[in-house]
Amino acid sequence: ENLQAEFLAINPFGKLPTLVDSSISMPNGEPLTIFESGAILLHLAESYSDDIKTIENKSLTNQWLQFANSTLSIALFVPSHREKEFPRLMKELDRQLATNQPLVGSIWGAADCAIQAYLAYLPLLFPQINLDPYPSIRTTIEHVQQRPAYRKAMGHD
């Protein structure tokens, strides 16, 4: 569907996800259209949430979005990096998640969503990866899999 003319009129790159925010108008009167998950998450957090209103939280959220969409995704999806970088990154990420606190601020937000989206891929795409050394990551994945939005997106409800 994303390569059909109707979608390409919204996003000429034909990529998912894409967000059309009709509450914000561009100078030409068209609704704001954003693609790339990190940009969408940042827009939603800045526009519709109080979790990144400070410069510190905005900077930290941006850091986690960049980490998820570059460092973590490369370590996960590029085989040579998966062997070299993945264990080290997972060890530190497990330590970060062990606090059971949001990555930024006091409520679950864009940073958590970005990281947890990639972690949720692990059991689906890489069932051979042993997550036993990363108990906090395992727990995080289990919690993600129980979220109503995740269950709906995966067709479980």
Residue ranges and their predicted role:
Residues 140, 156-157:
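Exported/periplasmic ABC-transporter solute-binding proteins
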Residues 9, 146, 155:
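Phosphate-coordinating loops and pocket residues in cytosolic domains that bind phosphorylated ligands
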